Amino acid sequence: MALPEENPVYGPFFGVMGAAAAIIFSALGAAYGTAKSGTGIAAMSVMRPELIMKSIIPVVMAGIIAIYGLVVAVLIAGSLDTPTKYSLYKGFIHLGAGLAVGFSGLAAGFAIGIVGDAGVRGTAQQPRLFVGMILILIFAEVLGLYGLIVAIYLYTK
């Protein structure tokens, strides 16, 4: 049985790559953000152990980045189908959605990690820096949210 030109046998491959890219790159960003800000918390908590729970916010925000990638990966994986029912166009759209959320999650995770590390160390020395750190972390988190919005918009095409 010959497949139509718009539904080649390799069409679903691009959808699978989109799902993989979504979770892999966003999880890499979340892992980096968690590790980088976690080391800052560990270094700060030696001198100021009472600030540990207050300083956990960057770690939580980094973990949310991975959830963005997970949502898109599950959406894409749920719509995968046999090559006869899955067009090349849909595969490319899903690849683009996965790359959008994945790379924006990677960038957001890097930003959260660097800001979180410096922020918790600075907050230990000057508590008034806490509000500024939170605001910068929110701006870094929104970078990942932009990727999620674009990915969901692409997915619905």
Swiss-Prot record:
KW Endoplasmic reticulum (keyword) present: no
Lumenal topology ranges: 1-10, 77-94, 155-157
Membrane topology label: Multi-pass membrane protein
Topological region Cytoplasmic: 34-55, 117-128
Keywords associated with the record: Hydrogen ion transport, Ion transport, Membrane, Transmembrane, Transmembrane helix, Transport
TM ranges: 11-33, 56-76, 95-116, 129-154
One of the record's GO molecular function terms: proton-transporting ATPase activity, rotational mechanism
GO CC annotations, alphabetized: proton-transporting V-type ATPase, V0 domain
Pfam families attached to this UniProt entry: ATP-synt_C
Location of the protein in the cell: Membrane
Positions bearing the site annotation: Essential for proton translocation: 141
KW Transmembrane (keyword) present: yes
Chain's role: Proton-conducting pore forming subunit of the V0 complex of vacuolar(H+)-ATPase (V-ATPase), a multisubunit enzyme composed of a peripheral complex (V1) that hydrolyzes ATP and a membrane integral complex (V0) that translocates protons. V-ATPase is responsible for acidifying and maintaining the pH of intracellular compartments and in some cell types, is targeted to the plasma membrane, where it is responsible for acidifying the extracellular environment.
NCBIfam families reported in the protein's UniProt record: V_ATP_synt_C
Subunit note: V-ATPase is a heteromultimeric enzyme made up of two complexes: the ATP-hydrolytic V1 complex and the proton translocation V0 complex. The V1 complex consists of three catalytic AB heterodimers that form a heterohexamer, three peripheral stalks each consisting of EG heterodimers, one central rotor including subunits D and F, and the regulatory subunits C and H. The proton translocation complex V0 consists of the proton transport subunit a, a ring of proteolipid subunits c9c'', rotary subunit d, subunits e and f, and the accessory subunits VhaAC45 and ATP6AP2.
Family: Belongs to the V-ATPase proteolipid subunit family.
Protein name: V-type proton ATPase 16 kDa proteolipid subunit c
Organism expressing this protein natively: Aedes aegypti (Yellowfever mosquito)
